[in-house]
Amino acid sequence: MRRARGRRPPGEFFDVGGHRLHLHCAGRGAPAVVFDAALGASALSWTLVQPEVARVTRACTYDRAGLGWSEAGPLPRTAGRIAGELRQLLHAAGVGPPYVLVGHSFGALVVRIFAARHRGETAGLVLVDPAHPEEWLDPSEDDRRNLDRGVRLCRYGASAARPRVAHVVAALARLGARRPARAIVAAITRGSFDRADENILAPVLKLPMDARRVLTRFWTRPEFFEALGSQIGAVCESASEVRDAERGGPDDLPLTTISATTSSARRLALQEALARSSSRGRHVVAHHSGHWIPLDEPALVVEEILRIVGRRS
């Protein structure tokens, strides 16, 4: 595995059946709070949240296989497979239940499956601008085209990473030069990467500079794009896995959904309904955030996590 240079991995590596995942835990106490990041994000996306939670209890971030500092894992990268690897990782590291599971975007699908499969190990859920399975169980033709485009873009990314084109884009993004970085990405992808600024380049600038350097180096690994492309290509299967795992399950788990102000009306309604599905559910709107709530309003995320932790302390 080629690790990102310039910053030593903050955590440790544990084998989960042929490949090693990076886990970083800080703080002491129970229940342990376990974070799962957005689709192509790493443990670094919790940089502004984890230290504050660690003041109160144990807080653990990790990198899914192929992302961040973790080694590549078997394909396809479905939420169900990832949830199984996460449980293996926690057991290998000696991080015992109960867990408060925190999932951002795609990570919400992973932690919902984990909670449904292991209800007795789960103390609560905090879902941050969560993807919802209903969005992908019956995708429209436009949705399918977008998924196909996402997979295709990841193939371009993997190809660009090998001759070090991605190094140039990463360096420009790290320095805040969005326009030339976006122009290069658009050229590589033949103009189809129309949301590069919002989804990939903008979040980089919300991180401290040292984390920014490491994050952009992650983009220079072909494994990153291969894992991301597999997650995108398998998102409909992941949605089905959530539906099947939760079928007939209990509805009294402490659960908080946090919505972004930029959420579509449909996504907002789904997130509100998800909170109502639990007798101990709660829905919150992050009024000053786009999709990257952990970077825009980390204090709000910390507050909602500790609200659930406090019930179990």
Task: Describe the role of every protein-language-model region.
Residues H19-W69, L109, R117:
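Conserved HGGG/HGGXW glycine-rich cap/lid loop of the alpha/beta-hydrolase fold
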Residues V34-A38, H104, D129:
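The conserved beta1-alpha1 loop
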Residues R64-V102, H118, E134-N146:
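Active-site loop/oxyanion-hole signature of alpha/beta-hydrolase fold enzymes
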Residues Y99-V100, A123-V126:
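Residue in the alpha/beta-hydrolase core beta-strand immediately N-terminal to the catalytic nucleophile
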Residues G103-G107, V111:
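Gly/Ala-rich beta-loop-alpha elbow adjacent to hydrolase catalytic centers
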Residues V126-L175:
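Flexible "cap/lid" loop of the alpha/beta hydrolase fold
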Residues A181, A196, P203-V285:
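Conserved serine/cysteine hydrolase catalytic core
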Residues S278-S313:
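Catalytic active-site module of serine/aspartate enzymes centered on a nucleophile-bearing elbow/loop
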